[in-house]
């Protein structure tokens, strides 16, 4: 018993609940008449597990793995859906009733093609900031992002006033944002100076402003905005799971945006009159009168929202200016007007001659197939066609439009690279949408950048090259 108690105290023995324990002799085990050596007793022994309170190695590994899985599950069920929903359009905000007027907003960056050519290292971050700022305003004012096309936004709103507030706040946000560079503003001013040199009647609205005055009115990317209100053909896209808006209202909103200048907000009389009298008192507008819009039978009464008091703008970019403008177009419709080759700059004539020489042996269908990527890449309107294939005039018009657009960008890049050069002495390589060089113009070579692509480029001597037409 003493030994048992001793062992029990040392934790080396236990009775596991046994009671009435006695010590028998071997004789007692063989003969029950022989009494036990000790009387039965129940020792005060308790079971004690020496590993109690400790976690084994296997259990520890299991706890670690289980904790990691639990953390992963929290991330998967919480954080991932948050980011997914954050970047997904909220269809609850989409106007869906066919009988309710919808206010549509179109936006576009002024001179984005020229900016990409001049500042390929800055524009990716600038455009990403542009998208982030606009999307934050869409959420703030309960509007709906319909789509983005390049650097253009199409936005729908159930409330006309919310749309107007968004457009006004957009201009203020861009004005007060720290873009981290003055290069974009300098490029806009250079573009205005270039146009003033080409057109004696044109007065640059910002290029000659005092620096302090300029900084109060302008900063960074300039975005033009057009607003129109009306009934729409509303459809849900089964692929994107979002809503889109078709018909006269969307066309009118796009046309309204297209005639504006960067930093300018235009709204049709339909949008303005959709506001209540109290709402109209909260905004500052300037009546612009009737404005002719491409594809619209009658002139449309237009208002300018003075989002940034003190800003002045050039005249509206009306139909006769659209085709030769260096801006990116948000529509793909064609203008009925065209210009002869003599209207093109030297650089544009060089590009046109190169394309004509390169594609001259192609069939009309082959020329159309080759030219469409250029039109899409440089965002120029496609020419009208009869049937499924462009005729010769259509192909020539497509070449002229592409050449006019690329030529203006090259002119801008040349002027920016060397302010002392008064006539175009450099050219560039014309690139396909996939990045392959399609046509290289030949003669004196210089270094230039076109739409963010830099390299040694050459110019064709139109007077000495017998292959040009």
Curated annotation (Swiss-Prot):
Side Cytoplasmic, residues = 81-469
Q: Where does Mg(2+) bind?
A: 108, 151
Q: Which family does it belong to?
A: Belongs to the adenylyl cyclase class-3 family.
The reply to whether Metal-binding figures as a keyword in the UniProt entry is yes
Where this protein primarily resides, as one coarse class? membrane
Q: Name one GO cellular component term.
A: plasma membrane
InterPro entries cross-referenced by the UniProt entry: A/G_cyclase, Adenylyl/Guanylyl_Cyclase_3/4, Nucleotide_cyclase
UniProt keyword annotations, A-Z: ATP-binding, cAMP biosynthesis, Cell membrane, Glycoprotein, Lyase, Magnesium, Membrane, Metal-binding, Nucleotide-binding, Receptor, Transmembrane, Transmembrane helix
The UniProt record lists the EC number as 4.6.1.1
Protein source organism: Trypanosoma equiperdum
Q: What is this protein called?
A: Receptor-type adenylate cyclase
Role according to the record: Could act as a receptor for an unknown ligand.
Which segments constitute the Guanylate cyclase domain? 103-257
Keyword Cytoplasm in the entry? The reply is: no
- The UniProt gene name for this protein comes to ESAG4C
According to its UniProt record, where is this protein located? Cell membrane
The protein's required cofactor(s) are namely: Mg(2+)
